[in-house]
UniProtKB/Swiss-Prot annotation:
Top-rank taxon: Bacteria
Record-linked HAMAP family: Ribosomal_uL30_B (MF_01371_B)
Keywords: Ribonucleoprotein, Ribosomal protein
Subunit structure: Part of the 50S ribosomal subunit.
Entry GO MF terms: structural constituent of ribosome
Alphabetical GO biological process terms: translation
Family label: Belongs to the universal ribosomal protein uL30 family.
Species assigned in the record: Bacillus mycoides (strain KBAB4) (Bacillus weihenstephanensis)
Protein name in UniProt: Large ribosomal subunit protein uL30
InterPro entries cross-referenced by the UniProt entry: Ribo_uL30_ferredoxin-like_sf (IPR036919), Ribosomal_uL30_bac-type (IPR005996), Ribosomal_uL30_CS (IPR018038), Ribosomal_uL30_ferredoxin-like (IPR016082)
Pfam family, one: Ribosomal_L30
Gene name per UniProt: rpmD
Keyword Ribonucleoprotein listed: yes
GO cellular component: cytosolic large ribosomal subunit
């Protein structure tokens, strides 16, 4: 079974490039301090890597 990751948006997307905004939205994060739980897949890990400066990640 794949590991679960708890992803929290900790910094605002205001003033960020459109591709970073789209990545945050694709992760399912809408507002500041919102949290989602996702499975650890290569696609999700790539998205996390792209916006790592805006989010915090913990194992769920």
């Amino acid at each position: 079974m794949a590991k679960k990751l708890e992803i929290t948006l900790t910094r605002s997307v205001i003033g960020r490039p459109q591709d970073q905004r789209a990545t945050v939205e694709a992760l399912g994060l809408k507002k500041l301090n919102s949290t989602v739980v996702k499975e650890e897949t290569p696609a999700i890990l790539g998205m996390i890597n792209k916006v790592s400066h805006l989010i915090t990640v913990k194992e769920a």
